[in-house]
């Protein structure tokens, strides 16, 4: 695998985490995949996922804005559930696996609304959260897991860009998928409008947590190499593209200083209201996200 140094660009750690650091991304000259090089050793990366990290965030008290914050977080899970509902009908006999489940709220919603057996995998143990009681939570990495029955639905919501072994993970996940099952993968889109707008201050350059950055072509190539068949590719996702627009503007204004998410809650929702006319066309504008729905090759 050859690296093209002319395509190297950088992401700064402190924009979301407050931790110092500058990390380089390079583009493979053979396959065009963009990835972090060098990267934090796998046994040290957990230090960058503290309780303030978005997917693991425990704080939910933001004063008068708390109801709005909780509604928005629940809306994200509702959008995930609506998206997967277009491709698979879940009931009490179904089995669902979420890789990189974080705080597990999506699985809790799926279990509560469909009765499906919900399993979550994450390397950070958040099993003490009350809603985790209804979830079969596995603390660890995907390659460390063993399952004796296949899953009807496997989801990777913004997990693959964090994974140190994405190709191996997809191949393993294919083996866990039922013959007629579906896998839903959502990641930031490198060839998006927001990347062109913000460049090195694009929120998708969330280093060192994001180790791989995917364009449409490199994402589809990776899933196909894993023996998966593309059912549909979407230029949007359940994660709100507006977050990348808001954070990208904030990163430019802050010029490298960390974004305090607690203080940003009010401006975030005010900006979302102003951007509402644009966001009506989120699914057509290629703003920030992409989703690919796949099945086992030859099973359709």
Where do the language-model regions lie?
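Conserved SAM-binding loop
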Residues: 79-198, 211-225, 290-298
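Aromatic-acidic/polar surface patches that form glycan- and anion
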Residues: 17-24, 73, 77, 211-212, ...
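S-adenosyl-L-methionine-dependent methyltransferase catalytic module, highlighting the catalytic core
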Residues: 164-172, 182-298
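Short loop segments at secondary-structure junctions
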Residues: 30-31, 40, 217, 297-300
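Conserved SAM-binding loop and adjacent beta-strand
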Residues: 65-80
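A structural signal for well-ordered alpha-helical segments within the folded catalytic domains
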Residues: 26-29, 75-78, 217
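Short glycine/proline-rich turn/loop motifs
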Residues: 60-66, 199-203
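N-terminal juxtadomain amphipathic helix
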Residues: 1-63
């Amino acid at each position: 695998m050859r690296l093209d140094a002319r395509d190297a660009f950088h992401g700064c750690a402190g924009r979301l985490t407050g931790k110092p650091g500058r990390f380089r991304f390079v583009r493979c000259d053979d396959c065009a995949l963009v990835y972090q090089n060098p990267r934090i050793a796998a046994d040290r990366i957990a230090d960058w996922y503290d309780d303030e990290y978005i997917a693991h965030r425990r704080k939910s008290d933001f004063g008068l804005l708390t109801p709005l914050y909780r509604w928005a977080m629940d809306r994200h899970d509702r959008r995930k559930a609506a998206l997967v509902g277009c491709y698979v009908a879940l009931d009490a006999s179904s089995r669902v696996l979420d890789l990189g489940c974080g705080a597990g709220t999506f699985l809790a919603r799926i279990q509560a609304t469909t009765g499906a057996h919900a399993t979550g995998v994450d390397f950070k143990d958040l099993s003490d959260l009350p809603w985790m009681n209804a979830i079969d939570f596995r603390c660890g990495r995907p390659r460390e897991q063993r399952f004796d029955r296949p899953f009807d639905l496997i989801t990777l919501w913004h997990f693959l860009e964090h994974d140190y072994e994405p190709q191996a993970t997809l191949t393993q996940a294919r083996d866990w998928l039922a013959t007629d099952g579906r896998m839903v993968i959502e990641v930031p889109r490198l060839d998006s409008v927001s990347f062109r707008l913000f460049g090195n201050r694009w929120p998708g350059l969330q280093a060192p947590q994001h180790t791989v950055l995917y364009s449409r072509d490199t994402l589809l190539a990776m899933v196909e190499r894993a023996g998966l068949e593309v059912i549909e590719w979407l230029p949007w996702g359940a994660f709100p593209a507006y977050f990348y627009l808001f954070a990208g503007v904030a990163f430019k204004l802050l010029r490298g200083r960390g974004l305090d998410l607690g203080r940003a809650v009010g401006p975030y929702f005010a900006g979302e209201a102003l951007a509402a006319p644009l966001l009506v066309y989120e699914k057509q504008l290629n703003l920030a996200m992409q989703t690919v729905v796949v099945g086992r090759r030859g099973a359709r």
